[in-house]
């Protein structure tokens, strides 16, 4: 299929050129930008619906504001693809999320038009406030605009930032992109007229004069005057909550109508007051019928056919780890009505959508609020329930204080299923699950597990369900399982006990997580080179299986620990035990294979693991290096 024809977009490769276009050309430019976006994502995959919803808003922002001098911060960044196309990156846009290509999120090192990197939600207002205050301190005059979705506004951090911005009376513009909850839908021409009126210079100068007069009144009359003005505007336009936080509220307005957007943005740009919140209502997937009809299915997409909207998904050889978790938890919940499930706005991503279909009264989606999710789970556990608080590894970082203070110190039996453990590929370093083993295994009394395959995951779900002595976690990766046979229900694992998968005599490979398959492949290659190799599945990073580690250390010349996590995790705990137990005193050759001490850019997971030395070849090379020998070529192909 040929690429769309885009004569106006071709003339506007950067915002300076866009600002030279007459306003009458902008609707056509938006249409061309939308067509380009659909064509791009159909070939690369990625986040489509959010970007389609902000096409007109993106065009309007870059037309009205002097970027990059003025700062635009996109919360999360899923919606930033149109922004990338308009800011000098169109020639590389078809490398999106590919190895060596453009990031799927905003990234400071990628463009001067990306003043702040993003990928986790609800950070834009805090970052924008910092930039606004920095501008004031430096004596510079610039506009700072934070664009945040209504979903991100469910996180407490956004309100913390707004409260601070209101107290500072900072010159900050927040655009609330309301594309899902429809907090207050626009009501046509009257809504647009009122929004334009209250954002204009005349109204605001009169308002400012009234405020100066009010300052001469007794305080109780000042408060009454302020409240009267706020509620009068709120009667027509809404926004009382934001006014209470110290923001001047404008909206709601139609985010797809440039005739409404442009004058309001200009009014706000030209005022000296702040902070201001502009409430813009948009539609996810706008302008592409399949995405409009099923916004949830077009949030993140694989490559797809533009005509039909059908996504191309390679056939799976095994069910996904996420699905195995969801179905396993359903099975356990049938045996125990105290089991409840908690997600922080990721029901389908964590597999809890399946659980919710069977047990809707026992499923809780708390929104983008990981801190609350963890302490909410702690409260449930304190009353005898068995909460499974399912959060991606990267997002669990957001609730770590609650894990320590509210769960671990009180030794409450909260279960933490940790999805997206290890490298996640196209989403890059912001979404990699690198650190959970390290930050959880450091906590006294915390049980930390990792599944080596889908059957082990099923066992760990049951083990967690029946473990009541304290907090417990189990991690598993994105993607499909390896195709092992699955029991109908998991087995109960002995806490702190691993397993020997293959017996050998010379080399021992101790795996924590799904690198077990690579360890087995490495053992085949080592065996072909005359090095008999034991392969063990640790299962637990805490408590460690001391007996297993002693056996591996005493009966082998080389011990290699392999994990899909950062330095400071499983291997570090094993090394400390080896040293404390005196097992390093007899000449044991030890190597620890972890993720590198850097943030790996996005790419294909297999290639990223190979780069990290965590594939078969990397493991084999580590063994030969420990022995002081050159690796020999394998007699078989990968």
Swiss-Prot record:
InterPro entries: Dxylulose-5-P_synthase (IPR005477), THDP-binding (IPR029061), Transketo_C/PFOR_II (IPR009014), Transketolase-like_Pyr-bd (IPR005475), Transketolase_BS (IPR020826), Transketolase_C (IPR033248), Transketolase_CS (IPR049557). Its EC number is 2.2.1.7. Keywords: Isoprene biosynthesis, Magnesium, Metal-binding, Thiamine biosynthesis, Thiamine pyrophosphate, Transferase. PROSITE patterns: TRANSKETOLASE_1, TRANSKETOLASE_2. Pathway: Metabolic intermediate biosynthesis; 1-deoxy-D-xylulose 5-phosphate biosynthesis; 1-deoxy-D-xylulose 5-phosphate from D-glyceraldehyde 3-phosphate and pyruvate: step 1/1. Binds 1 Mg(2+) ion per subunit. Binds 1 thiamine pyrophosphate per subunit. The keyword 4Fe-4S does not apply. Thiamine diphosphate binds at residues 78, 119-121, 151-152, 179, 288, 370. GO terms for molecular function: 1-deoxy-D-xylulose-5-phosphate synthase activity; magnesium ion binding; thiamine pyrophosphate binding. GO terms for biological process: 1-deoxy-D-xylulose 5-phosphate biosynthetic process; glyceraldehyde-3-phosphate metabolic process; terpenoid biosynthetic process; thiamine biosynthetic process. Homodimer. HAMAP family: DXP_synth (MF_00315). This is 1-deoxy-D-xylulose-5-phosphate synthase. It comes from Brucella anthropi (strain ATCC 49188 / DSM 6882 / CCUG 24695 / JCM 21032 / LMG 3331 / NBRC 15819 / NCTC 12168 / Alc 37) (Ochrobactrum anthropi). The gene is dxs.
């Amino acid at each position: 299929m040929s690429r769309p024809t885009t004569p106006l977009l071709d003339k506007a490769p950067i915002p300076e050129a866009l600002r030279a276009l007459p306003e009458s050309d902008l609707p056509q430019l938006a249409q061309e930008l939308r067509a380009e976006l659909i064509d791009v994502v159909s070939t690369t995959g990625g986040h489509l619906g959010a970007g389609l919803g902000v096409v007109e808003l993106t065009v309007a922002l870059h037309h009205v504001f002097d970027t990059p001098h003025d700062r635009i911060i996109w919360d999360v960044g899923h919606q930033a693809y149109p922004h990338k196309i308009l800011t000098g990156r169109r020639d590389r846009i078809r490398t999106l999320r590919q190895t060596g290509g453009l990031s799927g999120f905003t990234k400071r090192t990628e463009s001067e038009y990306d003043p702040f990197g993003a990928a986790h939600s609800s950070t834009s207002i805090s970052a924008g406030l910092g930039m606004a205050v920095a501008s004031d301190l430096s004596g510079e005059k610039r506009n700072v605009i934070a664009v945040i979705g209504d979903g991100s506004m469910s996180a407490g951090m956004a309100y913390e930032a707004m409260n601070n911005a209101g107290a500072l009376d900072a010159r900050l513009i927040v655009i609330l992109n309301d594309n899902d909850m429809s907090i207050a839908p626009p009501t046509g021409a009257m809504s647009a007229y009122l929004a334009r009126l209250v954002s204009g210079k005349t109204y605001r100068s009169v308002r400012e004069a009234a405020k100066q007069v009010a300052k001469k009144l007794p305080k109780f009359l000042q408060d009454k005057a302020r409240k009267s003005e706020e509620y009068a505007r709120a009667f027509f336009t809404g926004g009382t909550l934001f006014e209470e936080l110290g923001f001047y509220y404008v909206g709601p307005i139609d985010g797809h109508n440039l005739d409404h957007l442009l004058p309001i943005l200009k009014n706000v740009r030209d005022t000296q007051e702040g902070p201001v919140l502009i409430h813009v209502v948009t539609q996810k997937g706008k302008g592409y019928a399949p995405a409009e009809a099923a916004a949830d299915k077009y949030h993140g997409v694989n490559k797809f056919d533009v005509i039909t909207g059908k996504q191309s998904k390679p056939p799976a050889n095994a069910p996904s780890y996420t699905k195995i978790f969801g179905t396993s938890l359903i099975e356990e919940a049938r045996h125990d009505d105290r089991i409840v499930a908690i997600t922080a706005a990721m029901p389908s991503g964590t597999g809890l959508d399946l659980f919710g279909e069977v047990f809707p009264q026992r499923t809780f989606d708390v929104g983008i609020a990981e801190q609350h999710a963890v302490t909410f789970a702690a409260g449930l556990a304190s009353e005898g329930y068995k909460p499974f608080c399912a959060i991606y590894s990267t997002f669990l970082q957001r609730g770590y204080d609650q894990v320590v203070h509210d769960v671990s110190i009180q030794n409450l039996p909260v279960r933490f299923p940790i999805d997206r453990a290890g490298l996640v590929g196209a989403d890059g370093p912001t979404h990699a699950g690198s650190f959970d083993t390290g930050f959880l295994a450091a906590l006294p009394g915390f049980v930390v597990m990792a599944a080596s395959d889908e059957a082990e995951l099923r066992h760990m779900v049951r083990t967690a369900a029946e473990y009541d002595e304290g907090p417990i976690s189990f991690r598993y990766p994105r993607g499909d399982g390896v195709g092992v046979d699955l029991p109908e229900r998991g087995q109960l694992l002995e806490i702190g006990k691993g397993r020997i998968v293959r017996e050998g005599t010379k080399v021992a490979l101790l795996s924590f997580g799904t690198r077990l398959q690579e360890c087995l492949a490495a053992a085949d290659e080592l065996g072909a080179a005359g090095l008999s190799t034991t392969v063990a599945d640790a299962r637990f990073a805490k408590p460690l299986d001391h007996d297993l580690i002693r056996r591996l250390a005493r009966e082998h010349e080389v011990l290699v620990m392999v994990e899909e996590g950062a330095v400071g995790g499983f291997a570090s705990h094993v090394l400390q035990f080896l040293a404390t137990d005196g097992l390093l005193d007899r000449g044991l050759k030890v190597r620890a294979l972890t993720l590198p001490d850097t943030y790996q850019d996005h790419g294909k997971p297999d290639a990223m693991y190979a780069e990290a030395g965590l594939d078969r070849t990397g493991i084999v090379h580590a063994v030969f290096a420990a022995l002081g020998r050159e690796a020999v070529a394998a007699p078989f192909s990968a």
